[in-house]
Amino acid sequence: ITVCRPSWLYGPRDRASLPRLINAVQNRKAKIIGRGDNRLNLTYAGNEAEGCILAAEHPDAVGQAYNLSNDGIITQAEYFNKIAEAIGAKPVTRRVPYPVAQRAAFLMELTGHMFGRKKPPLVTRYAVWLMGRKCFFSCEKARQQLNWQPTVSYDEGIRRSIAWCRENGLA
């Protein structure tokens, strides 16, 4: 058995988190949680797939576990603003403290359940947790043992993801 551990995946065919984030940025409803300087560990889905294929085919990968994530550092504020730039929206500058965001998400989830809404709320507690945490996983082992390199940058991955969402009427 070989284990590939993705960090937070994004890319085409994401029908959940990215379309909601794109729409929130476009409609000026997105807020940076906390200071926005926390590092996100995002992985473009195509980069993850390439790493998994390499791990599946490499004879020395049996019994190993690999973290797979994009190159470089991207903070929450940078991620939001790369999306804003890619869709031609204004930068996201409004902020909300983490505890306030958690409580607001809880209330949005609760209201949705109470009124039987089919669509998920704009923000969930899980989304707040993902966006608000500080996170870094080294993928050096995958680089060394599998000769894996992420081939799609943050900018290109965001561009492709937004294009797919638009083509499919999700943003």
Predicted regions and their residues:
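Mid/C-terminal beta-alpha module of Rossmann-like enzyme folds, strongest
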Residues: L54, H58-L122, C139, R159-I162
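Glycine-rich Rossmann NAD(P)(H)-binding loop
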Residues: G11, I33-N38, Y66-I73, A84-I87, ...
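Residue-level signal for the nucleotide or nucleotide-sugar donor/cofactor binding architecture
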Residues: L40-G46, I74, F137, V152
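Amphipathic terminal alpha-helices
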Residues: F137, K141-Q144, Q149, S153-A171
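Alpha-helical membrane-targeting segments
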Residues: R20-L42, V92-C135
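Generic structural signal for alpha-helix termini and adjacent loop/cap motifs
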Residues: R28, H58-P59, A86, Q145, ...
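Conserved beta-loop-beta element that borders a ligand/cofactor-binding pocket
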Residues: I1-P12
